[in-house]
């Protein structure tokens, strides 16, 4: 089975920027960087971020020397921001106490920030040729179907891991890990798997039973709760926008955000205006912004106000030129809010307010 899969991989392997070419040794730094970025994130989303990081920090030493703010800004938009903090912390350990060398075992890798069992197995196999079973969502699907595992996830994970470990070959374990990833991503898809071109077809018990699409079995998910809140887009007449930094720990730790209320399931919309960061005449946009986090959904009302250029930022806040917002470490939900304001045809900036509006235009042109 492993031989059949590797033969297929040699013909159909995906061309990904972090993969070594056939016959070349894998670069542990590239493997590690890509695996951290790929955690719960699609390949298409990761590619530009991987290329950007590699161009800016081509080795772990340079990444370790970067400031935390620089790393967070470069990561902004990729999501799951604790990964960026752990990435930077890991780089400092590898570049410092470990003298620039990553551990080459699963156990050693798991001692580093941000590296769990799957990521450790993937790095150990791909970068160091260890006989490790890297089982992500794609691999779970492949092995659950291959062995017709009836136990639903997440309870089935230990059984799937054991089956995967049995199949990992002593030769080319890294290619085997990537072959399983590619098979799950391109052939053994969640819906309408292309069984007729699968290299493991004759070994697949799920296909033999006629129900591969129903595997892996899954325990019904609980409905994700919805939290509500409000965001305040406060802009001076020169175009600068009021922002603040979130606390270093917790959700979106260390990122830049627009001022706003707490996010609550029992949010009182009538009290939103009283929680504004500065006194001003606020206008509520007709549209709200929705965003999905891992454990809850979020919907935010947006309040917009324009203030004088002489207005000072309250404590813990700062004004950033509108043209500089894209360079801030803004999470996706904040970027959605900014885009909603920019698209709103009746915003103060688009309405125009005499000389103040003209100053704003000059400010944007000068950025």
Regions flagged by a language model, labelled:
Residues 1-20, 185-351, 355-367:
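Intrinsically disordered, low-complexity, charged terminal extensions of DNA damage-control enzymes
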């Amino acid at each position: 089975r492993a031989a059949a899969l590797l033969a297929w991989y040699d013909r159909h392997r995906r061309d990904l920027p972090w993969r070594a070419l056939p016959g070349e040794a894998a670069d542990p730094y590239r493997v590690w960087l890509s695996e951290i970025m790929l955690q719960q994130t699609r390949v298409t989303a990761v590619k530009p971020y991987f290329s950007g990081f590699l161009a800016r920090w081509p080795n772990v030493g340079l990444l370790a020397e970067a400031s935390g703010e620089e790393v967070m800004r470069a990561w902004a938009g990729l999501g799951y921001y604790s990964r960026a903090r752990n990435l930077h912390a890991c780089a400092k350990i590898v570049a410092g106490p470990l003298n620039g060398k990553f551990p080459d075992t699963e156990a050693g890798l798991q001692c580093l920030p941000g590296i769990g069992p799957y990521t450790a197995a993937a790095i150990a196999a791909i970068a160091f040729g260890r006989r490790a079973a890297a089982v992500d969502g794609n691999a779970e699907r492949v092995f659950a179907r291959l062995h017709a595992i009836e136990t639903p996830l997440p309870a089935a994970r230990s059984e799937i891991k054991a089956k995967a470990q049995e199949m990992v070959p002593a030769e080319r374990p890294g290619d085997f890990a990537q072959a399983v990833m590619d098979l799950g991503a391109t052939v053994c898809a969640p819906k309408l798997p292309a069984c007729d071109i699968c290299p493991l077809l004759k070994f697949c018990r799920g296909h033999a039973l006629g129900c591969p699409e129903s595997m892996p079995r899954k325990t019904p998910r609980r409905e994700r709760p919805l939290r509500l809140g409000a965001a305040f887009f406060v802009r001076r007449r020169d175009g600068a926008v009021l922002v603040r930094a979130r606390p270093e720990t917790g959700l979106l730790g260390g990122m830049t955000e627009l001022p706003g209320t707490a996010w609550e399931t029992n949010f009182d919309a009538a009290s939103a205006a009283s929680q504004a960061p500065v006194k001003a005449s606020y206008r509520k946009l007709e549209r709200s912004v929705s965003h999905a986090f891992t454990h809850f959904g979020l919907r935010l009302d947006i309040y917009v106000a324009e203030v004088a250029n002489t207005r000072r930022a309250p404590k813990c806040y700062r004004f950033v030129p509108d043209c500089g917002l894209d360079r801030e470490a803004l999470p996706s939900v904040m970027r959605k809010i900014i885009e909603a304001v920019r698209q709103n045809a009746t915003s103060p900036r688009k309405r125009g307010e005499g000389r103040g509006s003209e100053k704003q235009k000059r400010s944007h042109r000068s950025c």
